[in-house]
Amino acid sequence: MNLLILFFGYLFGSFPSGYLAGRIAKGIDIRSLGSGSTGATNVLRHIGKRAAITVFLLDVFKGVLSILLAKYLLLNDSWQVAVGLSTLIGHIWPVWLNWKGGKAVATGLGIFLGLSWQVGLATLGVFIIMITLFRIVSLASVSASLALPLIMFLSFSGSNLSLPFLIVSLLAMILVIWRHRENIVRLIRGKEPRIGQP
């Protein structure tokens, strides 16, 4: 039964919201444009604000839904984390799109909102602060992912810390940074575009 839930978690994550937005709105394959990601940032740059907001909310919802399902089925912390990871993997490597999906930010946010809404909101707060100051989505995404494990650790006191939650926060951080490796190179070179720039 639990393995079946992991499978459904992957399916939730692999729902190609960004790809469908491109096809429906403009008849394009968003993977062939810009960063090649199916995430909200690439959708914003090549389709528009309304489509990007829709994709962002759908991607967050995928993460939240998978964790809520795991909690509804009374799965323990380890299995909740496993379901979250399967959802994140589905988002990054969707079988329907030849394993080419998003960069794990919005769906990752949804997963952590589901696991611990306080941690999710605090991490979102870091993202909002960085995006407000610098207007560079990748910088905000990487900064929030780096802050995530610390936020997870600080949000629990002593024996209340869930080791699986802490481990998944570290894994999510690694995945987000790895998916943004090209952005990080451009950031170092001072060539990463800000919001509103092509």
Swiss-Prot record:
It is an enzyme of class 2 (transferase). It catalyses: an acyl phosphate + sn-glycerol 3-phosphate = a 1-acyl-sn-glycero-3-phosphate + phosphate. Pfam families: G3P_acyltransf (PF02660). Keywords: Cell inner membrane, Cell membrane, Lipid biosynthesis, Lipid metabolism, Membrane, Phospholipid biosynthesis, Phospholipid metabolism, Transferase, Transmembrane, Transmembrane helix. GO terms for molecular function: acyl-phosphate glycerol-3-phosphate acyltransferase activity. Its EC number is 2.3.1.275. Pathway: Lipid metabolism; phospholipid metabolism. The keyword Oxidoreductase does not apply. GO terms for biological process: phospholipid biosynthetic process. It is a multi-pass membrane protein. GO terms for cellular component: plasma membrane. The chain crosses the membrane at residues 1-21, 55-75, 79-99, 111-131, 136-156, 158-178. Its main location: membrane. It is found in: Cell inner membrane. Probably interacts with PlsX. Belongs to the PlsY family. Catalyzes the transfer of an acyl group from acyl-phosphate (acyl-PO(4)) to glycerol-3-phosphate (G3P) to form lysophosphatidic acid (LPA). This enzyme utilizes acyl-phosphate as fatty acyl donor, but not acyl-CoA or acyl-ACP. This is Glycerol-3-phosphate acyltransferase. The lineage of its organism: Bacteria, Bacillati, Cyanobacteriota, Cyanophyceae, Synechococcales.
